[in-house]
Amino acid sequence: MKRINIVLSGIMLFLTLLLSFGMSWGNKNFTSSQNVSSVQLAPSLAPMLEKVMPSVISINIEGSTVVHTSRLPHQFQPFFGHNSPFCQGNSPFRNSPFCRSNPNSNSMHEKFHALGSGVIINADKAYAVTNNHVVENANKIQVQLSDGRRYEASIIGKDSRSDIALIQLKNAKNLSAIKIADSDTLRVGDYTVAIGNPYGLGETVTSGIISALGRSGLNIEHYENFIQTDAAINRGNSGGALVNLKGELIGINTAILAPDGGNIGIGFAIPGNMVKNLTEQMVKFGQVKRGELGIIGMELNSDLAHVMKINAQKGAFVSQVLPNSSAFHAGIKAGDIIVSLNKKTISSFAALRAEVGSLPVSTKMELGIFRNGITKNVIVELKPSLKNSVSLGDIYTGIEGADLSDCSLNGQKGVKIENIKLNTQASKIGFKKDDIIVEVNQKVINNLNDLKNILDSKPNILVFSVKRGNNSIYLVSE
């Protein structure tokens, strides 16, 4: 019996110690969990977003565009309309209705609805910035704020070459504007937050980092100097905000690389500094009045540097300086390498073009020039464009895709097609590079102002008389 009592006493002592240890371990573990939770508590973007979201708007577009469709089988088309051999040269049929119109195609106005995003940048004036491709061909623009308020909006200015547009909300009060950050200070790896209206869902937020800076060569816009981010950007995000963790605007979301139509983590935004420079011109002039450096150039790569025996790896190689241009008067020469602009490194010709393309006429800037192994700085004042080139879409929203300039060649005045983009309204009408518009609706065109005055009257049909080489043809837009 005594032996049993001893055993029982030992068991009770063991259980007491075990229970005591378990309680002690449990309390210690509970305390440790509390400490870990407090340390690992993730920061939230909510406070920043609460400040930023009221400045981001959803945009609803009602518009129309001209659609050209063929009435004849492809094999018969060469025998009809202005391209027919019966309509060329001194043919007696050249000015007939048969040749003046294009019986091969039907033209019709097709209505459409589109969605996009925008960002309020001036609360007092109710100005918001978005992409040009969001509002082009718009007949009606309606915006919705984060608090549900809706307003009509009108276009203040737009620029198809950079894909930036400035709109104004009508009769809008008590708005919240975003601050535009200095995008020149951005670094690869900085955190980004994209805000917009993808697929019409309304306010949507995604996050990521800056994957690359100064992206170009994408053939999305004429002036390309994109911020690349892996923050998810989808359809409807165009024109929306790309912000930093302070809630400052660093870019306007513009495009994605999407082989299958969806986000794969490669999105592009127009830098905030370019947005600021262009919208300031739109407020002042109603359009972008670019200065021109007056050079022709190319990217500097290792092969070119080796052949030219240039001790430089990055920059904009100057292959030609146009007479009487800004570059000419600053002493820039063919063979020079432009390596900086206002002390900011220039890594490519595309980057130089984008930087200069956002600056207005009469801007003075400092260029770093590498020549004969020595870098020196020169001051350049931007002159007006020698070609006075503008986008046809900027003066007439019904036809996009052609760059125009005043022309006077061998006594023939008119408006010259400097460039043409494939699969645009201008190319479908039939315009080609180097065409010269000499008449519209039987009214003589001597310059861009003449063309703009006729297009501003918004006629139901446009019959363009065009000089193409030694031939005269007619192109029709209905």
Curated annotation (Swiss-Prot):
Any one GO MF term held by the record is: serine-type endopeptidase activity
User: Where, if anywhere, are coiled coils annotated?
Assistant: none
The source's superkingdom equals Bacteria
List the EC numbers from the record: 3.4.21.107
Pfam families annotated for this entry?
PDZ (PF00595), Trypsin_2 (PF13365)
List GO terms (cellular component aspect). outer membrane-bounded periplasmic space
Region spans: Serine protease = 116-254
Q: Where is this protein localized, as stated in its record?
A: Periplasm
Please state what the protein is called: Probable periplasmic serine endoprotease DegP-like
Q: List the disulfide bonds.
A: C87-C99
| Residues annotated as signal peptide | 1-26
Q: Where does substrate bind?
A: G236, N237, S238, L293, G294, I295, I296, G297
The record places domain PDZ at: 281-372, 387-469
Describe its function: Might be efficient in the degradation of transiently denatured and unfolded proteins which accumulate in the periplasm following stress conditions.
Q: Which InterPro entries match?
A: PDZ, PDZ_sf, Pept_S1C_Do, Peptidase_S1_PA, Peptidase_S1C
NCBIfam families under this entry? degP_htrA_DO (TIGR02037), PRK10942.1 (NF008189)
Family according to the record:
Belongs to the peptidase S1C family.
Q: Where is the active site?
A: H133 (charge relay system), D163 (charge relay system), S238 (charge relay system)
Q: Which UniProt keywords apply?
A: Disulfide bond, Hydrolase, Periplasm, Protease, Repeat, Serine protease, Signal, Stress response
